[in-house]
């Protein structure tokens, strides 16, 4: 029996907030300096512009969105894994795969994640709310049209439950084919 579940992914460190505040403060200081110097004011202003763009990128990628990892049933009754992002009033569905398409789930620390090489022909999706998390889980999927690796930041209990439900969904799919 596959029960529906929704888990809110939490930031596990403050690296993104610190990076945002530092880049934003340096960009403000750089803009202020560009008004008071005569020489290279355009260059200093452009550096400030680049830094403010970086700070906006950090804010929109790591601070503003809230990720939800959902296990639910779709309209046909099939169990699916869904990754949603909520930013303000806007909600976006990033990933929606059948639980029967999940092949395996691996726990990775930061060193293993950096050392991992995604094979050619396999798509990689990262739905991690933390900048440089200590632990992530890599979900390997195989569907009729593509193979993919999905990186999420969830608890070990959620990953084990997701794997258990994927095995149950594959077994139910095999029973329905016979």
Regions found by a protein language model. Give the residues of each.
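Hydrophobic alpha-helical transmembrane segments
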Residues: 32-53
């Amino acid at each position: 029996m596959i029960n529906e579940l929704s888990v809110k992914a939490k930031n596990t460190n403050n690296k993104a907030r610190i990076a945002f505040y530092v880049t934003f403060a340096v960009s403000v200081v750089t803009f202020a300096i560009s008004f008071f110097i005569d020489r290279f004011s355009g260059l200093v202003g452009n550096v400030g512009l680049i830094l403010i763009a970086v700070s906006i990128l950090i804010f929109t990628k790591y601070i503003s969105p809230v990720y939800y990892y959902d296990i639910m049933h779709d309209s046909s009754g099939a169990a699916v894994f869904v990754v949603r992002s909520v930013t303000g009033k806007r909600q976006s569905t990033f990933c929606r795969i059948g639980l029967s398409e999940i092949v395996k789930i691996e726990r990775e620390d930061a060193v293993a994640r950096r050392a991992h090489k995604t094979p050619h022909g396999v798509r990689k999706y990262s739905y991690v709310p933390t900048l440089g998390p200590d632990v992530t889980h890599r979900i390997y999927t195989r569907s009729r049209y593509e193979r993919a690796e999905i990186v999420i930041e969830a608890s070990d209990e959620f990953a084990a439950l997701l794997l258990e439900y994927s095995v149950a969904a594959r077994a139910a799919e095999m029973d329905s084919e016979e």
